Regions:
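A polyanion-binding, active-site-adjacent surface
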Residues: 2-150
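Glycine/proline-rich loop-helix segments at beta-alpha junctions forming the active-site rim
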Residues: 1-9, 34, 121-205
């Protein structure tokens, strides 16, 4: 498992994309500066998680203390595996707080020790910049690898990009329960928390 984390974090396509304007990942890779934040494999204890959330790609904060190529391998693995534990609660992102609430609709009182998050595209960018150009390439390269580590029962596809790959996720994980929900950052008219919760519960059966 640690090998997969490092393979994704140090994805060999990044350097290829920097040198090739026609590479599917060129746009998203070149959106970062010289201090490249590593490709994000997943967050949490994926092999022990009971719920996995999949969204489009990780957002980027240039000021975050986040792994770069200068980090030791063991520190990179530890960062992603233990990210929820090492991040103070007052620094949790809106996304983290939201999925924790959603997870509680599936398994009451669940904590981040049993939740993992990953993305279709593993490179970071702001507002999904470059995602549509590289999503098929990235999913083909890494989605099966990531899902092979996950032993839990529930997969939540958050937002449009993740749901494009619904059939592929089902093919890889035919025995999982897959729940689809709009991304909270893209408001849907009339979709209250109560309606979203009921939609979650309806998809559990």
């Amino acid at each position: 498992m640690n090998n997969i984390i490092l393979e994704i974090a140090k994805c060999c396509e990044v350097e290829k994309a920097k040198l090739n304007d026609s590479h599917s990942c060129n746009k998203i890779v070149m959106s970062q500066n010289d201090s490249f934040q590593l490709t994000e494999p997943w967050n949490g204890h994926l092999d022990n998680a009971e719920i996995l959330f999949i969204s489009s790609n990780p957002s980027i904060d240039p000021n975050e203390n986040y792994p770069t190529a200068s980090w030791k391998d063991e520190d990179i693995v530890s960062f992603f595996e233990n990210r929820f534990e090492i991040t103070p609660k007052n620094e949790w992102s809106t996304y983290w707080r939201t999925i924790l609430k959603w997870a509680g609709w599936i398994i009451p009182n669940i904590g981040f020790d049993k939740i993992a998050i990953t993305e279709i595209v593993h490179c970071k960018s702001q507002k999904e910049f470059g995602v549509y150009e590289c999503m098929n390439f990235c999913a083909e390269k890494w989605l099966k690898e990531v899902l092979s580590v996950y032993n839990g029962k529930y997969i939540v596809l958050v937002g449009k990009v993740a749901q494009i790959f619904n059939d592929k996720v089902k093919e890889i994980c035919p025995n999982k329960i897959i729940i689809k929900t709009p991304h909270f950052s893209r408001p849907v008219k009339g979709l209250t928390d109560e309606k979203r919760k009921q939609d979650f519960l309806d998809q559990l059966h």
